């Protein structure tokens, strides 16, 4: 700083030795997910390498005869598979190594083959669709045949038919999150359930809780007693500073 540019009213602060990090205190806690600032801190201490957990490898696919991937012809009664792209983005943000296995048809043999391939090549598996009670919903059945179903159906909407368990194949095992096929249910069950479990599997010591806001709804909200419901809506700031919700 040029002395001529320093005025009498300006506060000039000298850096103090040890003000960023005191001797004897850990620079970073075990289980912390490394962020860009953490890498800079390590570099400032002359540390080029630190022991870390291996990236979690997650395989995922969608199930359904009606699903088409982007670029394929959309036949009558079919829809484009959006869930895989949603899961791809959420898993990438989480820092996982991902294996996109595409769309699997509603066929028990095809589903078993996909489960076995995923189990032998990943730490965890995420599927979307096939966990309800329809005639072509084979995910829960296949989970039971290849391993166990820890739980199926939860007191939450959207996302009630979610299934969770562990499957085995040729000496390998993997946790399996069977998410519903509804796109909103996929995001809700991933964010509130699967994401927390995956972070724990990564070795993260602290899982950040989702931000909570107290808002006033502009319309009546009905829900079944004992069931947690997540509503989509738009938040707006009122003239009095209160936050309101419209769905």
What are these regions (language model features)?
Residues 65-66, 130-133, 181:
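Short glycine-rich anion-binding loops that position phosphate/pyrophosphate groups of nucleotides
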């Amino acid at each position: 700083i040029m002395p001529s540019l320093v005025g009498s009213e300006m506060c000039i602060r000298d850096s103090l030795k040890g003000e960023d990090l005191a001797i004897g205190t850990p620079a970073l806690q075990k289980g912390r997910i490394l962020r860009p600032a953490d890498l800079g801190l390590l570099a400032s201490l002359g540390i080029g390498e630190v022991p870390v957990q291996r990236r979690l490898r997650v395989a995922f696919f969608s199930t359904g005869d009606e699903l088409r991937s982007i670029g394929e012809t959309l036949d009558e009664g079919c829809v484009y598979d959006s869930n895989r792209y949603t899961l791809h983005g959420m898993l990438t943000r989480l820092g996982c190594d991902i294996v996109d296995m595409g769309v699997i048809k509603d066929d028990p043999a095809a589903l078993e083959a996909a489960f076995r391939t995923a189990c032998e090549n990943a730490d965890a598996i995420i599927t979307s669709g096939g966990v309800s009670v329809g005639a072509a919903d084979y995910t829960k059945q296949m989970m039971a045949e290849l391993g166990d179903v820890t739980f199926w159906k939860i007191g939450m909407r959207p996302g009630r038919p979610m299934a969770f368990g562990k499957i085995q194949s040729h000496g390998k095992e993997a946790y399996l999150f069977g998410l519903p096929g509804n796109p909103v249910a996929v995001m809700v069950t991933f964010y509130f359930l699967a994401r927390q479990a995956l972070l724990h599997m990564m070795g993260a010591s602290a899982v950040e809780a989702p931000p909570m806001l107290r808002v006033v709804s502009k319309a009546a909200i009905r829900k079944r007693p004992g069931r947690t419901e997540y509503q989509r809506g738009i938040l707006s700031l009122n003239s009095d500073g209160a936050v309101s919700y419209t769905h």
